[in-house]
Every structure is written in structure tokens, then in C-alpha cells.
């Protein structure tokens, strides 16, 4: 066991490990140490200041799920954009579950929207489930507000995948887009631009959202594919 692993096990909550394993199918139970996210997040902020951090970021693959979660949190703190992209591209092939994928949210991305868009297009075309999911999620996080352009909706709309965690992310993206950019997004639903399962899941998630008006929800209900 490495010295870092010893420190991680010192934060272990075995009940939480069992809970996390149920939420993350496909990841072996023995991979979970069981560290609560707020605890791991606090540790990550301190660990970034240590010399061992850089070494850890280049030691792939990791043995434990919690090490991958830590890796994602550490990447999110990297301040240099080019280095952050390098580390993200190195790590994504090793991401094997939605939780690790979704915890990655690099702060530096917000300052590099133009360069980031090219990376998003590449990630979204990947055949690797969680690289594709990360690309769509990053688009959703950074380009549905003041940096929005209607043409960006084509990126997730063109994704064709039978992978559950990709389809769910596309649905999540379009439900969020309906809430934030209704006029540009609703034609994608009205014209059946998405695969049937994703189309209906988008409508379901949008109807569940408090950001969608009652009138909009009523219209969406008429667009379900039966």
C-alpha cells in the first residue's frame, strides 16, 4: 500500500463504500475505499500543494475508485489550461464510471472557451463512453448561457450511441438546453432530431424541471414518441 493509499484509508467509511458501489454498477466492490465526496474534496485542495500530487497524476491506472475520484478533483484544480487539457486527455481513457466522469469540472475551462470548443467536439465524437459523456457535459456546463450559439446543439444531436451513460447525458443536455435556450432547442424535439429513447428521456427530464414553464411542459407532453 502506498503512503497516499494509507492516508485515503484513514478517511474510510465502509457504509458509504457499500452505498457508492450500489450507485456505480460495473465497478468491483473491492475498488471502493468509501470516502465521502466533501471529505475527499477538502483533501484534494490540500494535496495539490504537495510534491506527491504531480507524481500521483502521472501514475495511471489507479487501484481504487476513490483514487480516480481524487484524480478528477485534482485535475479540476489545475490552473494552467494546456496542462489541464494534457492531464484530462491522459486520464479520460481510464475513467470507467459516471461518478468519476461527472466530478471532473476544471475551473480553468471557463477562461478558454474558444480553444475548449475544439476539444469538446473531439471528446464528443469518441467511442469511449466516458470521454464522449465528458465532452457533452462540458458543453452543457459552459455553453448554454452567455456563450451559447444555436449551432452548438448539433454537437450532442449528432452523437449516436447505444451506451446508457451517453444517452442519459444527451438527454440531460437537451433538457437543460430547453430550460435555458428554449426557442433554439425546441425544434430538435419537434422535428424528432434525437433517437426515440433519448427524445422521450429529454422530455421526461424537462417536465421534471422547475425551470420549464407549465405551458412549455404541456407542449412537450404532446411531443412524446409513443
Model-derived features: where do they sit?
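Alpha-helical scaffold domains
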Residues: 1-226
Amino acid at each position: 500500500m502506498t503512503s497516499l493509499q494509507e492516508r485515503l484509508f484513514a478517511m474510510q467509511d465502509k457504509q458509504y463504500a457499500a452505498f457508492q458501489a450500489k450507485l456505480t454498477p460495473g465497478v468491483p466492490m473491492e475498488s471502493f475505499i468509501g470516502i465521502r465526496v466533501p471529505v475527499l474534496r477538502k483533501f484534494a485542495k490540500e494535496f495539490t500543494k504537495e510534491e506527491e500530487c504531480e507524481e500521483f497524476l502521472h501514475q495511471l491506472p489507479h487501484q481504487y475508485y476513490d483514487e480516480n475520484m481524487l484524480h478528477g478533483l485534482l485535475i479540476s484544480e489545475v490552473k494552467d489550461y494546456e496542462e489541464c487539457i494534457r492531464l484530462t486527455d491522459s486520464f479520460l481513457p481510464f475513467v470507467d464510471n459516471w461518478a468519476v466522469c461527472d466530478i471532473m469540472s476544471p475551473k480553468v475551462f471557463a477562461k478558454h472557451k474558444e480553444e475548449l470548443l475544439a476539444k469538446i467536439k473531439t471528446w464528443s465524437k469518441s467511442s469511449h463512453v466516458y470521454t464522449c459523456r465528458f465532452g457533452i457535459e462540458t458543453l452543457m456546463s459552459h455553453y448554454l448561457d452567455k456563450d451559447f450559439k444555436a449551432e452548438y446543439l448539433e454537437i450532442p444531436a449528432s452523437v449516436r450511441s447505444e451506451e446508457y451513460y451517453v444517452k442519459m447525458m444527451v438527454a440531460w443536455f437537451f433538457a437543460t438546453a430547453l430550460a435555458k435556450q428554449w426557442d433554439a432547442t425546441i425544434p430538435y424535439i419537434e422535428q424528432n432530431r434525437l433517437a426515440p429513447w433519448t427524445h422521450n428521456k429529454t422530455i421526461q427530464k424537462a417536465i421534471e424541471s422547475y425551470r420549464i414553464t407549465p405551458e412549455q411542459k404541456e407542449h412537450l407532453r404532446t411531443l412524446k414518441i409513443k
